[in-house]
C-alpha cells in the first residue's frame, strides 16, 4: 500500500488508528494530544489515565471513542539533545512499535504525525527521513495503508540544498519556458489560418479510404503493453514495481488486468520512477498514455529534475511536490 502525505487535522482522519505523540504521562497531553483528547471524549481520558506512563520509543493503545478512528496509538518520542544519545534509534522505535501494535490489533490503515520534530527539538530534515525510511521499509512487508499527516505546508519541506537545486532548475526551465511561450502565443494568434494541415502516415491512410479495421490494426503499442514489456526488460517483479511506485496492490492489479486502462499522469510518472526510466523512456511511456512531459507544467518540471539527476526516491519526490503544492505521485486521496 502507498505512503500518503496529507495536510489535515489528525483528529479528523478516517483511518483504523491514529498516532498521538505524547509525553511519558499519558494522562497529561500536549497541544495535539489535547486536541485528540477533546475530540475523543471523557472515556478516552479515563483509559489514558489507566494506562499510566509510556517509555520513550514505546507504544500503547486505547480505543478512539468519539473519534473517526477506531484506535489511538500513543507513543513517546525522544527529546533531541545533540544527536549522540541514540535519539535516532528511539525515534525509529516510535514508528516501528506503533506499526506493530496497529497490525496486532487488525488495523489496515494508520495515520502518523511527525514525531518529535516540534517541541522536542528533533531536526526536521532528519526527523522526516527517519519517519519516511521507517514507514516505507515497513510497507515492503505489509498491505497497511499509511498516512503521514501534517498540519501545514511548513511542517514538511524538502531539504534546503535540494530545494535550492530544484528552484534553480525550475527557474531555468519552467519560468523561462512559460515566458517564451507567452511571447509565441501572440505570434501564433497572428498566423491562424496560414499554416497548412499536415497529416501523419496513419491519417493519410485513413483519408485515402482505408477501412476502420485496418486503421485500428495500425495503431501504436498500448500503454499496457509498453509498461509490462518494460517491467520484463528491467527484470523486476510486479510487487517491486508497485511498492516503488507508491501504488496499492489493488491499483496495480487494475492496471494489469485492463489492457485499455488509462492512468492519471501522476501514475505514469510514479511507474517511471519505479522502473528507473531515463527521461526519453519516461516521455515514451507518457506518450503511450496520451500525455507529454512539458515544461509548461510545474509537476513535470520537478519530476524531470529528479529523473535527469538519477534520483528515484519517490518519497523524496513527493515531499518536494508537496512543498510546491503539486499533486503527489502514486498517492491515494483519503
Per-region residue spans from a language model:
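Active-site-proximal loop/helix of nucleotide/amide-processing enzymes and allied scaffolds
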Residues: 88-101, 116-145, 262
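The alpha-helix within a helix-turn-helix
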Residues: 231, 242, 272
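Recognition helix of helix-turn-helix/homeodomain-like DNA-binding domains
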Residues: 246-263, 287-290
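Glycine-/small-residue-enriched capping loops at alpha/beta junctions
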Residues: 1-102
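Short, basic-rich loop-to-helix N-cap that marks the start of a DNA-contacting helix
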Residues: 259-273
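Divalent-metal-activated hydrolytic enzyme cores
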Residues: 122-209, 213, 329, 333
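Short, charged recognition helix plus adjacent turn
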Residues: 284-311
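A short, Lys/Arg-rich alpha-helix, primarily the initiator
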Residues: 201-238, 315-334
Amino acid at each position: 500500500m502507498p505512503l500518503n502525505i496529507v495536510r489535515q487535522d489528525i483528529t479528523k482522519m478516517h483511518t483504523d488508528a491514529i498516532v498521538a505523540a505524547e509525553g511519558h504521562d499519558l494522562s497529561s497531553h500536549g497541544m495535539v494530544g489535547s486536541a485528540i483528547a477533546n475530540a475523543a471524549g471523557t472515556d478516552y481520558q479515563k483509559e489514558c489515565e489507566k494506562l499510566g506512563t509510556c517509555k520513550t520509543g514505546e507504544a500503547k493503545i486505547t480505543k478512539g471513542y468519539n473519534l473517526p478512528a477506531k484506535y489511538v496509538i500513543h507513543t513517546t518520542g525522544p527529546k533531541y539533545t545533540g544527536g549522540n544519545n541514540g535519539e535516532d534509534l528511539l525515534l525509529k522505535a516510535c514508528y516501528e512499535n506503533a506499526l506493530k501494535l496497529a497490525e496486532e490489533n487488525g488495523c489496515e490503515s494508520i495515520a502518523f504525525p511527525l514525531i518529535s520534530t516540534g517541541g522536542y527539538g528533533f531536526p526536521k530534515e532528519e526527523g522526516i527521513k527517519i519517519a519516511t525510511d521507517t514507514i516505507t521499509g515497513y510497507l515492503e512487508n505489509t498491505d497497511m495503508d499509511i498516512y503521514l499527516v501534517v498540519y501545514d505546508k511548513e511542517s514538511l519541506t524538502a531539504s534546503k540544498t535540494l530545494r535550492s537545486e530544484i528552484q534553480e532548475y525550475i527557474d531555468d526551465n519552467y519560468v523561462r519556458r512559460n515566458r517564451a511561450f507567452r511571447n509565441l502565443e501572440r505570434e501564433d494568434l497572428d498566423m491562424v489560418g496560414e499554416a497548412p494541415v499536415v497529416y501523419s502516415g496513419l491519417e493519410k491512410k485513413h483519408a485515402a479510404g482505408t477501412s476502420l479495421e485496418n486503421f485500428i490494426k495500425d495503431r501504436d503499442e498500448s500503454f499496457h503493453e509498453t509498461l509490462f514489456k518494460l517491467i520484463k526488460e528491467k527484470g523486476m517483479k510486479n510487487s517491486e514495481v508497485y511498492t516503488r511506485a507508491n501504488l496499492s496492490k489493488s491499483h496495480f492489479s487494475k492496471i494489469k488486468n485492463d489492457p485499455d486502462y488509462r492512468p492519471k499522469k501522476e501514475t505514469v510518472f510514479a511507474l517511471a520512477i519505479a522502473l528507473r526510466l531515463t527521461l526519453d523512456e519516461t516521455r515514451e511511456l507518457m506518450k503511450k498514455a496520451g500525455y507529454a512531459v512539458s515544461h509548461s507544467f510545474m509537476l513535470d518540471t520537478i519530476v524531470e529534475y529528479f529523473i535527469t539527476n538519477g534520483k528515484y526516491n519517490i518519497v523524496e519526490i513527493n515531499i518536494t511536490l508537496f512543498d510546491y503544492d503539486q499533486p503527489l505521485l502514486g498517492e491515494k486521496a483519503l
